[in-house]
Amino acid sequence: MSLESLFQHIIFTEHQAEESRRVMREVRSEIARCRGKIKKATEDLNEEKIKLESKVQQFSEKTFLLELLKTRENALERQCSAIVSERDRLLQACEAIKKKTTEQEERFIKEITDFNDNYEITKKRDALMEEDIKLEMADLENQAEALRGEMKSMEYNSGQLQELQKLKSELLQELFTLQKKLKVLKDEETEAICITKHLEAEKIKIREKPQHDPECVRRLKRELDLYKEEDMESVCRALQIEVDLLESTLVPKDPQDNNSLSR
């Protein structure tokens, strides 16, 4: 080998060593940025976990409250049915009493009229009979007033049932919203798992290649550029493992290059 060839080989070797050091500096810079991203992603993940746990707790509490409301609603519905049945029974009894009272009143008036016609009772006796009739009518009016009070009470209970049904609808809507948010979180988790599996496969491919292959460095840079904007902990962790592996392989190579240059 001539001196000129040897000199060109030395220059080429130095150029390769300088290029390797430059790539190493870039990789270390990317490592620092990735570590920052990992730290931020970890903090964000912890915050999201805390929020999710809080939402799950709220969801459990509201589910428990919803079950209580369902139990209360069923009890009120049974009570309302019983009240409606009792109201119908009382109305029927009231109608029967009114009908019976009307018949008795008509029969009583007829008997009084016949008695007066037969025995010519004085007007004072007529007044006493009329007073008795008024007392009976007043008693019937009191009974009717009591029935109207019971009907108003049943209407009030029906209003409470409507308010509970409205509250139930609001809780069901909130439950549906929480279920949608939980589905979104599960989809994100599934996507992160798929990306992690892909990176594991890529890591196996890298280990099968020669550890000093510059193509590994270029591929790693492309992977870092591709995922450096991602905000997922699994991606950053996989890239960190690859970078550490390449760094541990390339660092011992520099002293060998320096020894070659000195020889």
Curated annotation (Swiss-Prot):
GO terms for cellular component: cytoplasm; sperm midpiece. Detected in spermatozoa (at protein level). Predominantly expressed in testis and in spermatozoa from the caput and corpus epididymis. The keyword Coiled coil applies. Keywords: Cell projection, Coiled coil, Cytoplasm. It is found in: Cytoplasm; Cell projection, Cilium. InterPro entries: CCDC172. Residues 13-191 form a coiled coil. The keyword Coiled coil applies. May interact with TEKT2. Belongs to the CCDC172 family. PANTHER family: COILED-COIL DOMAIN-CONTAINING PROTEIN 172 (PTHR22419:SF2). This is Coiled-coil domain-containing protein 172. It comes from Rattus norvegicus (Rat).
